[in-house]
C-alpha cells in the first residue's frame, strides 16, 4: 500500500502569469487544461497557501458561469436513502459506515450496531416514503459477502475461494438476497431507483466471467433507473492505494460507468476530497470525469463531497488530522463548475456542509442543493453533524432567502416544479403520489399530513 507521505505536490507554474492566464481562460469560457485547473484551485502555484483576493476572483467567475448555464434556479429532489446493509469487508480507511461482515454471521455472538434489510423490508420502507410524496430512493450499501447479482451468480460463487469474497446466505442472521431482488423490490414500491455504484457493480460480477454490461443490463431489467457515480473518491490510483486499497482501480470505475451508460442508465459523478490527496490529484480527477462525459454524454450532475474525518480510520490512525478548509471547499465547487464544461449541474451537499455553508456554496458555482433525505447513515456514521432530513418548506425558505428560485426536480432533472415559498402549505409535487402535502420525517414525530412542512 502506498504511504500517504509519498504523495508530493511538485507542480510549478509555467510562467509568472499562470494564474492570470488560467483565470482569463475561465472567464472567456475556453476549455481549461489540467494546468489551468491546478492554478485556479490553488489560487496560483507561485504562492504558498490560498490567496484570498485571487480566491474571490475564481468564485466570481464560477458564479457567473453557473448563472449563464443554469440561471438562478436551485434544485433539489424529494428522496429517501435506503441503505440495505452495513456489512462490508472492503476496509476503506475513509469510511465508518461499514461493519465487518463476520459480525453478521449467525455464529458470531457479540452485538454490533449494523443492519441488513430483506427485499421485503426495503420495499416497505420505500413504499411508505413514496406514499408520503418522495420521488427517488437512493440505495448505496456495504459489499455484503452473501450479495450476488442474482441467484445464478450466487450459485456460481465458491465460498472456499477467498477471491470470491462469498459466504452463503445461511451463514448470516439476515439474507440480503441479491442486487436484482433488492432493486426489484424498491422499483415495485413505485420509486425512481438510483442505485448500484461502480463498486457495487464490481461486487456483482466477482468470480464470474461476465462484465459490467451484463450487470447493469440485468439490473435495468429489474427496475434500476439511474446509477450514482460514487465510490470514485479520488480517481488517481496512487491515492486510492492509500485510502481504499481494496477497491476497484480508476480504469475499472470508468469502465463500469461506461457500461451503465451503454445500458441506458443515467449517471451522476462525485469526488471525495480533503484527505491525503493534493490539488493536482483533484484536478486530474476532474479531468477523468470530463473525458468520461465527452464520451458518454450521460452524467447529469457532479457532486463534490468534502471528507468528514471524525470517526474514520484515516483520522484515528493519524494519517490525516482534519478535512478540507472552508476555502478549499469553495474552490472545489468553483473549479468543478469551471473545469467541467460538459456537466450542467454542480451540487452543494447540506449533509456534508450544513445549511449555512451549503447555501454559501450555491454562490460559488453550485446550483443543486441535494435532497430531502428521509434517512441518512453514511455521513452520520463518519461523524457528520448536520442531520438527516430537510423538508420542502425548509428548502423553499433557505433558497429564497439567498435570492434564488427553489425548484423540486426529478433525479434526471427532466421534471421540475417551482416552489412558491409564500404558499400556505409547501410539499413535494414530482413523486407519483406527491400532491403538495407537506413532507415530514418520521423522526420529527409529526403526522405525515400535518401542516407546516
UniProtKB/Swiss-Prot annotation:
Source domain of life: Archaea
Signal sequence residues: none
Amino-acid positions noted as binding [4Fe-4S] cluster in the UniProt annotation, renumbered to this chain: 88, 92, 95
Class in the EC hierarchy, top level: transferase
Keywords from the UniProt entry: 4Fe-4S, Iron, Iron-sulfur, Metal-binding, S-adenosyl-L-methionine, Transferase
Listed Pfam families: CofH_C, Radical_SAM
Protein family: Belongs to the radical SAM superfamily. CofH family.
NCBIfam families in alphabetical order: PRK07360.1
Subunit and partners: Consists of two subunits, CofG and CofH.
Name used for this protein in its record: 5-amino-6-(D-ribitylamino)uracil--L-tyrosine 4-hydroxyphenyl transferase
Organism, as annotated: Halobacterium salinarum (strain ATCC 700922 / JCM 11081 / NRC-1) (Halobacterium halobium)
Amino acid at each position: 500500500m502506498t504511504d500517504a507521505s509519498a504523495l508530493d505536490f511538485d507542480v510549478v507554474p509555467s510562467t509568472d502569469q499562470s494564474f492570470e492566464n488560467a483565470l482569463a481562460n475561465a472567464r472567456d469560457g475556453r476549455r481549461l487544461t489540467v494546468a489551468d485547473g491546478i492554478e485556479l484551485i490553488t489560487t496560483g502555484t507561485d504562492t504558498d497557501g490560498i490567496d484570498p483576493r485571487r480566491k474571490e476572483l475564481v468564485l466570481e467567475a464560477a458564479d457567473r458561469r453557473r448563472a449563464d448555464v443554469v440561471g438562478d434556479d436551485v434544485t433539489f429532489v424529494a428522496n429517501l436513502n435506503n441503505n440495505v446493509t452495513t456489512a462490508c469487508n472492503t476496509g476503506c480507511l475513509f469510511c465508518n459506515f461499514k461493519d465487518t461482515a463476520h459480525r453478521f454471521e449467525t455464529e458470531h455472538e457479540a452485538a454490533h450496531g449494523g443492519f441488513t434489510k430483506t427485499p421485503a423490508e426495503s420495499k416497505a420502507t420505500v413504499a411508505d416514503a413514496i406514499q408520503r410524496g418522495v420521488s427517488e430512493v437512493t440505495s448505496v450499501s456495504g459489499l455484503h459477502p452473501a450479495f450476488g447479482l442474482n441467484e445464478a451468480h450466487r450459485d456460481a460463487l465458491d465460498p472456499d475461494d477467498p477471491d470470491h469474497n462469498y459466504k452463503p446466505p445461511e451463514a448470516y442472521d439476515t439474507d440480503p438476497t441479491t442486487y436484482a431482488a433488492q432493486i426489484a423490490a424498491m422499483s415495485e414500491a413505485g420509486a425512481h431507483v438510483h442505485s448500484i455504484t461502480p463498486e457495487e457493480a464490481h461486487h456483482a460480477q466477482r468470480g464470474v466471467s461476465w462484465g459490467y454490461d451484463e450487470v447493469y443490463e440485468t439490473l435495468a431489467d429489474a427496475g434500476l433507473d439511474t446509477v450514482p457515480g460514487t465510490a470514485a473518491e479520488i480517481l488517481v490510483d496512487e491515492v486510492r492505494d492509500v485510502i481504499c486499497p481494496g477497491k476497484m482501480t480508476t480504469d475499472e470505475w470508468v469502465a463500469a460507468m461506461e457500461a451503465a451508460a451503454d445500458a441506458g442508465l443515467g449517471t451522476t459523478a462525485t469526488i471525495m476530497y480533503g484527505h491525503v490527496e493534493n490539488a493536482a490529484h483533484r484536478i486530474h480527477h476532474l479531468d477523468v470525469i470530463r473525458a468520461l462525459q465527452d464520451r458518454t454524454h450521460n452524467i447529469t450532475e457532479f457532486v463534490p463531497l468534502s471528507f468528514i474525518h471524525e470517526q474514520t480510520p484515516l483520522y484515528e490512525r493519524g494519517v490525516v488530522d482534519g478535512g478540507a478548509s472552508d476555502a478549499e471547499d469553495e474552490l472545489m465547487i468553483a473549479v468543478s463548475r469551471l473545469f467541467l464544461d460538459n456537466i450542467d449541474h454542480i451540487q452543494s451537499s447540506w449533509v456534508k456542509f450544513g445549511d449555512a455553508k451549503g447555501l454559501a456554496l450555491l454562490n460559488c458555482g453550485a446550483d443543486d442543493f441535494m435532497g430531502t433525505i428521509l434517512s441518512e447513515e453514511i455521513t452520520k456514521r463518519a461523524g457528520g453533524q448536520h442531520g438527516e432530513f430537510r423538508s420542502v418548506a425548509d428548502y423553499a425558505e433557505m433558497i429564497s432567502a439567498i435570492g434564488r428560485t427553489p425548484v423540486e426536480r426529478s433525479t434526471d432533472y427532466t421534471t421540475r416544479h417551482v416552489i412558491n415559498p409564500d404558499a400556505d402549505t409547501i410539499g413535494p409535487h414530482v413523486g407519483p403520489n406527491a400532491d403538495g402535502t407537506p413532507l415530514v420525517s418520521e423522526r420529527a414525530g409529526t403526522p405525515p399530513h400535518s401542516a407546516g412542512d
